[in-house]
């Protein structure tokens, strides 16, 4: 479930990034995928609290690391806007408002595209980790 939802988000996000298109559906799917990661972590915690453990300790690394990946990806997403502003030598987001309308749209499109790429990549990493977790989930 975790791998499937995040794979769908990664594919849609990658496609939209490639085509330089915004996608409300991607963000919704990404958030659902992130929610599935949280739900999976809660299930793992509940099983551990109940005394049921995987015989392979790598399982816990692969199963819980997606939470950290999501956090780091969100930080990179936040930083992506500042990177674009720095590239254009703009001091802050308000300075974009002083640009001609066409340039404003270009800056916003670059920021959205970078954010989309970062988050689609993070979803792809989560897919890999979820599949590895599934492969190491022994002994429950």
Annotated model-derived regions:
Residues 1-140:
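Polytopic transmembrane helical bundles with strong interfacial aromatic enrichment
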């Amino acid at each position: 479930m975790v791998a499937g939802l995040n794979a769908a988000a990664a594919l849609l996000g990658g496609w939209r990034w490639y085509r330089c298109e915004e996608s409300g559906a991607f963000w919704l799917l990404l958030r659902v995928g992130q929610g599935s990661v949280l739900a999976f972590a809660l299930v793992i915690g509940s099983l551990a609290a109940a005394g049921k453990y995987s015989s392979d300790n790598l399982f816990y690394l692969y199963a819980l690391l997606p939470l950290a990946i999501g956090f780091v990806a969100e930080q990179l997403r936040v930083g992506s806007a500042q990177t674009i502003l720095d590239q254009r030598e703009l001091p802050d987001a308000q300075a974009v408002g002083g640009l001609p309308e066409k340039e404003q749209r270009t800056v916003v499109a670059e920021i959205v595209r970078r954010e989309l790429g970062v988050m689609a990549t993070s979803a792809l990493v989560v897919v890999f980790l979820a599949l590895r977790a599934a492969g190491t989930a022994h002994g429950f």
